[in-house]
Regions:
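Gram-negative and organellar
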Residues: 1-298
Length: 298
């Protein structure tokens, strides 16, 4: 399946501006330049994705899923923040005859190794390459909920410098439930991970939690929402700035409406906020977007 989308976005922080009035360096306080504070902007969104499902003709229904996407976000004013990304992933699904983990009482367990490659370009210059391997174990529990347990390792290479290059090791656990009688779906996910870089002050531990809710509405509209919170503590003091501890919150709302067999409309609203003990990392903003999608390519 192929999907092509074109959209528009308004953001209150198009220049990735600082949400603070001063910066503390040692015992000194420096005023933040007004041009470094957040400013609004509009951008155009482009996205193409291709997904392929290879049936392995296995009695249990094993398959391989391939996915590729290209996305671009081009700003009207702050073009230095134009961003492009490429994603390629491969996922192999093994439908198991029995549950191999007794502490999960699962029905229809599935084991899924996954490889995900990411490339990010900022203003026509590559800034990041990432290679992630994950091992997922999923199925249905006795209470009717769906469960997903995942271990992952993510190798990151930043073009800006070798000190930040490193790897994430993490685990996540989540469940989703169907609300009786309403077709609503709700769930949660817990994340525990650490990052080990070439410089000790880039080491951190991250703890996160997500809550999600989705529900079909009248006239074929589909509503979905997600709240996520992350708490990230660095192991060592940052040079000049001292202790770094970040708390990040994101709230997403989305409305999707199919139009016929080939077209769909997508409206999104995202609120973000980052609180940090170092003022230059404080950020906040909101994005409002609208996209048109087409998916009937031959």
């Amino acid at each position: 399946q192929q999907n092509l989308s074109l959209g528009w976005k308004h953001t209150t922080n198009g220049n990735s501006g600082i949400n603070a009035d001063f910066i503390e360096i040692g015992d000194f306080l420096l005023d933040v330049d007004p041009e470094s504070k957040r400013e609004g902007d509009q951008s155009t969104l482009y996205n193409y994705s291709l997904s392929i499902d290879q049936d392995l003709n296995h009695p249990r229904g094993d398959n391989i899923q391939y996915f590729f996407s290209y996305g671009a976000d081009r700003f009207n004013t702050y073009s230095q923040f134009d961003i492009q990304s490429n994603v390629f992933s491969t996922r192999r699904n093994f439908h198991l005859d029995e549950n191999y983990f007794s502490f999960f009482n699962l029905e229809d367990p599935v084991f899924s190794p996954n490889i995900n490659l990411l490339r990010v370009v900022l203003n026509r210059e590559e800034i990041l390459r990432s290679g992630r391997i994950s091992l997922d174990y999923s199925g249905q529990l006795d209470d009717g909920s769906s469960m997903l347990f995942s271990y992952y390792r993510d190798e990151k290479t930043f073009k800006s410098g070798g000190q930040k290059n490193g790897r994430i090791n993490g685990i996540s656990f989540g469940q989703s439930y169907v609300w009786p009688g309403s077709q609503a779906l709700y769930g949660y996910k817990i994340i525990l991970e650490n990052y080990r870089a070439n410089a000790g002050f880039e080491f951190y531990e991250n703890y996160g939690i997500e809550f999600s809710y989705s529900q079909p509405l009248k006239e074929n509209w589909q509503f979905s929402s997600k709240y996520s919170y992350q708490d990230k503590s660095h192991d060592e003091d940052y040079p000049l700035f001292g202790d770094r501890h970040d708390q990040m919150e994101t709230l997403r709302f989305n409305l999707l409406k199919p139009i016929g067999a080939c077209w769909s409309l997508n409206f999104g609203w995202v609120l973000t906020g980052t609180h940090s003990t170092i003022n230059i990392y404080k950020r906040s903003g909101s994005n409002l977007s609208a996209q048109v999608n087409y998916q009937c390519f031959k």
